Amino acid sequence: MYIIKVGGGSGINLDGVVADLAAIKEPFIVVLGANAARDHLAALTGHQKIELTSVSGYSSVYSDAEAIDLIMMAYSGLRNKRFVELCQQNSINAIGLTGLDARLVQGKRNKGIKVRE
């Protein structure tokens, strides 16, 4: 089985990705990013994205309650279902799940990072 990560940036060619997936004969799971969709929804709703940089140089997005709502709308809603639709149009029988569904993915909360001001 293959696990394939597809980025969530605005430059991702999903039509090309799905065409490549249609040629795969082995079972696969796609992990789909949606950061561009999240940023677009944030702009539409007037929510300003806050980026943080740790002292080690790692960048991340601060996620307050409104940002979490936008993340869920983008990842499990728009991007997920549009990708499933595109797969179905290309004869790939697909289902879109998130890590929240049936606790498919569980992680440990980061205890915090030291942020550069």
Where are these regions (language model features)?
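Nucleotide/pyrophosphate-binding catalytic subdomain
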Residues: M1-E117
